[in-house]
């Protein structure tokens, strides 16, 4: 019987220790060495140095050196490979359920990273279709996509694709292998990457599944044919390097005294029949948080059934002051004045996400001496079809314990400031914008650093690629989280295993890449669904006072550019009007402006939990949080790949051709 993922990891880690002991090799804990990455074993990054007398690997923020003779070193590496083969590799599993009118079709997968294979088991449910279509794509396109076809009468599969005209065509190279066929399900296998130009390459990030079925018609050749019953789903066939499972795959067990608290709207008022509404709900927690501290160990969205298409995202804030309970528009002038103290964000959720699990060593603190018991939920309703009379009582569900865990957990916002300064020109295929959390802000983190255990990337409709990278001493040392094919319709909290260690003085860069080819006007940075955002909510411990670390291109840079290059009134015009008054972004204008965004000074939000900025310290008196130079980066020998979005070069200008 094949071992489970957690068993395989236990065997591997135990085997590493056994091999080192057997060969009498010694381990030293040292700082990172600049050595080329050779291969990766779970959370062990193994390095082969220029000297043949040592083998190095790193785990977390530390590096280790195995000292020994060359012969023993070769034996150790060989045994490590054998051990990985024995353990069956690291396996990632996932599942989606497609609702197809007659039945629910369930697609499960097991991804074997070591063997570079993925097995799909497809369960037909109550009514097996005559023909099943399973498509894979980055962004949900139904043409130019990879397809697996299954014909029930013949019990046959076919590796196919849809061409630009949506026609289903058999692939010249058949890369799917039928492993099992039963009355109620089939199992197929494929390599993650086949090097076939008609096949989908499974990569870290979101994969969009297009599932279609037909009963009675077996000769359908166009995926747009109305006889198909269709559904779209989202999943991750491959997890990123910090998403690997560890020994503790299950969420931490809840304490016995856990209380369940629901904070939601009990107002009978319907959702307004306008496109964008932000509703605020202020509630008092139903237990004594003035004299006692509690830990939130789990949070779940509480979305009114049937309203999933209207509730776009939610945030919940702690209030510093005692505030009267209230429910209504966040922009209502009758909103309690003291609600301004509700600024400490403790959780965020977006459509498509599940619960937030805290690790066993940490919990989100609520209450304590001198603390108030009030929280505010902010709900963003997206109602483009202007539905009327929809009653909603969505909110958050908390799992709270009085048995305090070792660490207080915190949440921090990274990315771009919500501002029209961060706007995107029209007709751009891959317009990258970077939000910086520089060393001047992260120096306020605890001396021992923080451990990021979860990450939630968020953008709106034109976002296509989102990621946050970590830099130390100007050198990129890895990613916190990355989604190569982001979808605003399936957002999820990514648990990070192992945790990502961030030290004071590190720089975090959050990058969002937008596609505005279908838009004829500028897409402004802002709160509406048609505007754009770029955010990464990171969940971490131990808690710090840093809550917001975001940036924008400085207003002074923008005003100087639009004044000098486009003859606009740089002093009195609104930033949004300046963007709108550029009549033609072609003929090199977009390329020139892209360069301005990447070299101009920036405006920083480095904010405490009370909304106040940290004191700015710089030897350069000309700089401030409102006008500071962006970080500089250098190449390091252990990660030599330049990220073309975070560190642009002339090599990348093909994007503008």
UniProtKB/Swiss-Prot annotation:
Pfam families: Cu2_monoox_C (PF03712), Cu2_monooxygen (PF01082), DOMON (PF03351). The keyword Transmembrane helix applies. Cu(2+) B binds at residues 458, 460, 533. It is an enzyme of class 1 (oxidoreductase). Disulfide bonds join 280-330, 319-342, 437-549, 441-606, 512-534. The active site is at 278, 458. Residues 103-214 form the DOMON domain. It catalyses: tyramine + L-ascorbate + O2 = (R)-octopamine + L-dehydroascorbate + H2O. Its EC number is 1.14.17.-. The chain crosses the membrane at residues 77-97. Glycans are attached at residues 104, 143, 555. Binds 2 copper ions per subunit. GO terms for biological process: dopamine catabolic process; norepinephrine biosynthetic process; octopamine biosynthetic process. Cu(2+) A binds at residues 312-313, 380. One of its GO terms (molecular function) is copper ion binding. Disruption phenotype: Worms are viable and healthy, but have slightly reduced locomotion rates, and defects in the inhibition of pharyngeal pumping and egg laying in the absence of food. Belongs to the copper type II ascorbate-dependent monooxygenase family. Required for the conversion of tyramine to octopamine, a precursor of octapamine but probably itself a neurotransmitter. Involved in the regulation of egg laying, which is inhibited by tyramine. Due to its involvement in octopamine biosynthesis, also required for crtc-1-dependent regulation of AMPK-mediated longevity. This is Tyramine beta-hydroxylase. The lineage of its organism: Eukaryota, Metazoa, Ecdysozoa, Nematoda, Chromadorea. The gene is tbh-1.
């Amino acid at each position: 019987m094949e071992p489970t993922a957690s068993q395989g990891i236990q065997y591997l880690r135990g085997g590493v220790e056994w091999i080192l002991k057997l060969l009498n090799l010694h381990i030293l804990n040292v700082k990172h060495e600049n050595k080329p990455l050779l291969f990766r074993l779970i959370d062990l990054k193994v390095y082969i140095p220029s000297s043949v007398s040592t083998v190095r690997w790193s785990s977390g923020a530390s590096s280790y050196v195995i000292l020994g003779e060359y012969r023993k070193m070769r034996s150790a590496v060989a045994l490590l490979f054998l051990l990985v083969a024995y353990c069956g590799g690291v396996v990632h599993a996932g599942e989606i359920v497609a609702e197809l009118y007659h039945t629910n079709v369930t697609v499960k997968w097991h991804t074997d990273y070591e063997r570079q294979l993925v097995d799909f088991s497809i369960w037909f449910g109550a009514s097996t279709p005559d023909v099943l279509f399973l498509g894979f794509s980055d962004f949900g396109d139904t043409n130019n996509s990879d397809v697996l076809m299954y014909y029930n009468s013949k019990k046959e599969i076919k590796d196919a694709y849809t061409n630009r005209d949506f026609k289903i065509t058999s692939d010249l190279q058949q890369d799917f292998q039928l492993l099992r066929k039963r009355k109620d399900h089939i199992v197929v296998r494929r390599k993650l990457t086949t090097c076939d130009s008609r096949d989908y390459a499974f990569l870290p990030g979101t994969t969009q599944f297009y599932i279609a079925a037909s009963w009675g018609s077996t000769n359908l050749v166009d995926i747009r044919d109305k006889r198909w019953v269709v559904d779209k789903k989202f999943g991750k066939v491959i997890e990123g390097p910090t998403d690997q499972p560890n020994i503790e795959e299950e969420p931490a067990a809840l304490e016995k005294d856990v209380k369940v608290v629901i904070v939601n709207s009990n107002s009978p008022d319907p959702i307004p029949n306008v496109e964008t509404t932000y509703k605020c709900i202020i509630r008092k927690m139903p237990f004594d948080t003035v004299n006692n501290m509690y830990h939130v160990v789990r949070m779940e969205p509480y979305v009114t059934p049937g309203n999933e298409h209207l509730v776009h995202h939610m945030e919940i804030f702690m209030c510093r002051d005692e505030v009267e309970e209230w429910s209504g528009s966040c922009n209502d002038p009758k909103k309690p004045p003291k609600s301004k103290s509700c600024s400490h964000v403790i959780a965020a959720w977006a459509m498509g996400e599940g619960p937030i699990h805290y690790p066993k060593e940490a919990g989100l603190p609520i209450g304590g001496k001198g603390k108030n018991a009030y929280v505010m939920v902010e709900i963003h309703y997206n109602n483009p079809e202007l539905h009327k009379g929809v009653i909603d009582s969505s909110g958050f569900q908390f799992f709270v314990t009085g048995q305090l865990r070792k660490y207080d957990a915190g949440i921090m916002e990274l990315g771009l400031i919500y501002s029209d300064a961060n706007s995107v020109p029209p007709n751009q295929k891959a317009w990258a914008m970077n939000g910086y959390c520089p060393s001047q802000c992260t120096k306020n983190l605890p001396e021992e650093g923080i451990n990021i255990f979860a990450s939630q990337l968020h953008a709106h409709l034109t976002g296509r690629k989102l990621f946050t990278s970590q830099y130390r001493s100007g050198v990129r040392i890895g990613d916190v989280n990355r989604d190569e094919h982001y979808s605003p319709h399936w957002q999820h909290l990514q648990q990070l295993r192992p945790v990502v260690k961030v030290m004071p003085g590190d720089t975090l860069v959050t990058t969002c890449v937008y596609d505005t080819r279908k838009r004829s006007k500028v897409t402004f940075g802002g709160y509406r669904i048609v505007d754009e955002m770029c955010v990464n909510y990171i969940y971490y411990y131990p808690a710090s006072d840093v809550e917001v670390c975001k940036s924008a291109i400085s207003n002074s840079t923008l005003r100087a550019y639009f004044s000098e290059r486009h003859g606009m009134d740089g002093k009195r015009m609104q930033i949004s009007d300046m963007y709108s008054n550029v009549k033609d972004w072609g003929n090199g204008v977009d390329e020139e402006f892209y360069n301005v965004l990447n070299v101009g000074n920036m405006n920083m939000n480095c904010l405490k939990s009370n909304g106040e900025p940290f004191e700015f310290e710089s030897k350069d008196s000309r700089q401030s949080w409102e006008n500071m130079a962006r970080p500089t980066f250098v190449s390091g020998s252990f990660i030599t790949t330049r990220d073309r979005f975070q560190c642009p070069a002339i090599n990348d200008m093909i994007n503008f051709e």
